[in-house]
UniProtKB/Swiss-Prot annotation:
It holds the Pfam family BMT. Belongs to the BMT family. It comes from Komagataella phaffii (strain GS115 / ATCC 20864) (Yeast). Residues 517-564 are annotated as: Disordered. Residues 517-558 have a biased composition (Basic and acidic residues). InterPro entries: BMT1. The gene is BMT3. Its EC number is 2.4.1.-. This is Beta-mannosyltransferase 3. It comes from the Eukaryota. One of its GO terms (cellular component) is membrane.
Length: 594
């Protein structure tokens, strides 16, 4: 019996070994047992079944870093580049909050949230009062023909989305037309072990959180999904920020849903980290998928190299504050390489990203957030922005943050890019489409499709004056290593200054074209009315105080007069008593004398 068991064990082990070797040796960078691996997708996100809508023209003004040592001092006009993109109508990415709520309440960590809902409300009313969602980030998984999206779901006991008890990250999948696939599952290979796993959606990401009914702003915020090329398949990493266990520090984390939900916290000893860490911009080097890189900050421009195993980060590149990008740049989408392999200089890479600007006291509102286009370049261990555009709004009337529903009716105008979902060349003619997810007014998650971005970049040109050795075009950007230290940095600083000046001009124009002048007139009219009202209130207050004072003085005088009268009466009576006593004394004397 023991011999038969040993034989059985040996046979099983041999079979497993054969399977393992078959997996390893059948992997040819294109598939494993017919399951395609990243970079060799058999599916397009934009096949004939996909409806993208009618594309409209979108003019984009950009500014290009100039690299010529002998070029004159250049103005923004010399560095400008004007081109045309095509953009689709926006498509709001909806979700079934009833289904999501049920999944969340099934989770042990969040089951007690049900006790904080208003008991007398119906299920629909509970969802409307307590549950909110915004800020979704996604990537297209060509191996599975779906969009993988992670959104922030907010629970508020008091019914205010901006005062949540906790936030929860929920992963969803959508078909190519952005229809949510509820109750569906994916069979995925663990990107590191090759083991088959089953994932049901929507899926509450299992991230430890410490909350109670009296807590505020707990849980995970600002999800960013970036696709890593794992050994056995795609590895969508979800980056987010949350409070640490002591609830005093907010740090950046990554969870890998396809790799047994492995979670790491990023940290560094190279400089003092802030109390709140957020807005790191992730990207991968094409030849290094085992670590993740971040643009930690734009001012100073600081690039980190971080371990995906333990979260330890080192500074790879840093510019001093004087040469950093503007502090008005606040984060960006995860950066993506160009959509097709093209000849490029050795030790050089290029990424596209959409940073966002935060401009205060401009045009339509007190604060305006808008995307801009950025071409980010690595040459060896040097990093810089080759191109920055002005503000981009995709031709949208941005949802007002608050107010009466008009574009200029609230204190904030918020359009924030979340992620580049996909970018691919769709045909033999070289036409390309990029899908970008974004949020408006912290209320919604939508997607737009941009056609012709690769063409826009490929036709790029810059300063071509007589001092230039040759034209500063896209081919030169790709083929040459032209980072030359201070000169490039100074030009790069000029470029971002031009782009931000253009963004401020856009902001002002946005207000003018959307009734900002009338709004300001009405605001001034309201200010004068309010000022008049306050003056009238002040006048009435002074009159009332004067009247009160006069009444008090009159009353005091009357009381003093009354007191004086009373004293006189008392003195009179006292005198009369004294006279009476004297009279009585005299009478006593007379009686004794007799």
């Amino acid at each position: 019996m023991r011999i038969r068991s040993n034989v059985l064990l040996l046979s099983t082990a041999g079979a497993l070994a054969l399977v393992w070797f078959a997996v390893v040796f059948s992997w040819d960078d294109k598939s494993i047992f017919g399951i395609p691996t990243p970079g060799h997708a058999v599916a397009s996100a934009y096949d004939s079944s996909v409806t993208l809508g009618t594309f409209n023209d979108m003019e984009v003004d950009s500014y290009v870093t100039n690299i010529y040592d002998n070029a004159p001092v250049l103005g923004c006009y010399d560095l400008s580049y004007h081109g045309l993109l095509k953009v689709s109508p926006k498509h709001e990415i909806l979700c079934d909050m009833k289904f999501i709520r049920a999944r969340v309440l099934e989770t042990e960590a969040y089951a007690a949230l049900k006790d904080l809902e208003h008991k007398k409300l119906t299920e629909e009313e509970k969802i409307e009062k307590h549950w909110f969602t915004f800020y979704g980030s996604s990537v297209f998984l060509p191996d599975h023909d779906v969009h993988y999206l992670v959104r922030r779901v907010v629970f508020s006991g008091e019914g205010k989305a901006n005062r949540p008890i906790t936030s929860i990250l929920v992963a969803q999948i959508y078909d190519k037309n952005w229809n949510e696939l509820n109750g569906h599952f994916l069979n995925v290979l663990n990107p590191n072990t090759g083991k088959l796993q089953h994932h049901a959606f929507p899926q509450v990401l299992p991230i430890a959180v410490n909350w109670d009914r009296n807590s505020k702003y707990r849980g995970q915020e600002d999800p960013r999904v970036v696709l890593r090329r794992g050994r056995f398949g795609p590895d969508p990493l979800v980056m987010f920020n949350t409070l640490t266990q002591n609830n005093k520090l907010r740090r950046l984390f990554t969870i890998s849903p396809f790799d047994q939900y492995k979670t790491v916290m990023y940290r560094t000893n190279a400089f003092k980290m802030q109390t709140t860490e957020k807005n790191w911009v992730p990207f991968f080097l094409k030849d290094d998928q085992e670590s993740v890189h971040f643009v930690y900050s734009f001012n100073p421009l600081r690039v980190l190299n971080c371990s995906l195993d333990n979260g330890a980060c080192d500074v790879l590149f840093e510019l001093p504050h004087d040469f950093g990008m503007s502090s008005e740049l606040r984060g960006a989408t995860p950066m993506l390489n160009l959509p097709q392999a093209i000849p490029m200089a050795d030790d050089k890479e290029i990424w596209v990203s959409f940073p966002r600007t935060r401009i205060s006291d401009c045009g339509c509102s007190e604060t305006m957030y808008r995307p801009m286009l950025m071409l980010f370049v690595r040459e060896g261990t040097n990093f810089f922005a080759e191109l920055l555009s002005s503000s981009i709004d995709f031709g949208l009337e941005v949802i007002p943050y608050t107010g009466d529903g008009l574009p200029c009716s609230s204190g904030q105008s918020v359009l924030i890019p979340n992620s580049i979902d996909n970018w691919e060349v769709t045909g033999s003619n070289g036409e390309d489409i990029l899908s970008l997810t974004f949020s408006e007014a912290d209320k919604s998650t939508s997607v737009v499709h941009i056609r012709g971005l690769y063409k826009y970049l490929s036709e790029l040109d810059g300063y071509g004056g007589p001092e230039a050795e040759d034209e500063h075009n896209f081919q030169r950007i790709l083929s040459d290593l032209h980072f030359d230290g201070k000169k490039t940095i100074e030009n790069f600083k000029k470029v971002q200054s031009c782009a931000l000046d253009a963004a401020k001009a856009y902001c002002k124009e946005y207000g003018v074209t959307r009734g900002e002048e009338d709004r300001l007139k009405n605001k001034e009219k309201e200010r004068k009315i309010e000022e008049k009202r306050k003056k009238e209130e002040e006048r009435k207050k002074k009159e009332e105080e004067k009247k009160k004072k006069e009444e008090e003085e009159k009353k005091k005088k009357e009381e003093e007069e009354e007191e004086e009268k009373r004293l006189k009466e008392l003195k009179k009576k006292l005198k009369e008593l004294q006279e009476e006593l004297e009279k009585q004394k005299d009478e006593v004397k007379d009686t004794k004398a007799k």
